[in-house]
Amino acid sequence: MSKSSWLLLLGLCASGSALAASAESAFLAQHGLAGKTVEQIVDTIDQTPQSRPLPYSASITSTELKLSDGEQIYTLPLGDKFYLSFAPYEWRTHPCFNHSLSGCQGEMPNKPFTVKVTDSKGAVIVQKEMQSYRNGFIGVWLPRNMEGTLEVSYNGKRASHAIATRDDSQTCLTELPLR
């Protein structure tokens, strides 16, 4: 292949990535997410006061954030942190493995909870009062590759569940019946 053919091929490849990057940038700007880190994007979407479902798709796996406008899918790696979103409930829940930031709706929106996450050695990772978002979920960023327990309490009722933050772990925990 000649030098000019290589340059043309390189230019086409570069312009393809530039087009993909500009489409992703336009999507982020359209939804008020431009200039944010992946953590900030996740927090912004999960905590939005808009009713579900949102006008775009956003879901989080153990390794990446997936955004879509229905035509293209944009994926952003999470890096060294893990996002766990959970929805305590009193009466009803839904099955969930990967949290849909744009679609999941829990039973108890805008409620105060006491949240505690401990690792398998008993070290406290998170311990604080948190309010569920409009979608009824609460999200926490945790260290990757840990096992532990999530405990939640509300009005004298408690729920707990084993958790893990590995590459194959769930990011949506809805099995938290308050008793």
What are the roles of these predicted feature ranges?
Residues 132-140, 150:
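Glycine-centered loop-to-beta-strand initiation motif
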Residues 76, 82-89, 167-179:
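Extracellular beta-sheet/turn segments enriched in Thr/Pro/Gly and aliphatic residues
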Residues 1-7:
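Bacterial N-terminal signal peptides that target proteins for export
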Residues 122-135:
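Short, acidic Ser/Thr/Gly-rich low-complexity loop/linker segments typical of extracellular
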Residues 146-154:
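A short, solvent-exposed beta-strand micro-motif common in secreted/extracellular proteins
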Residues 80-124:
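Mature extracytoplasmic domains of secretory-pathway proteins
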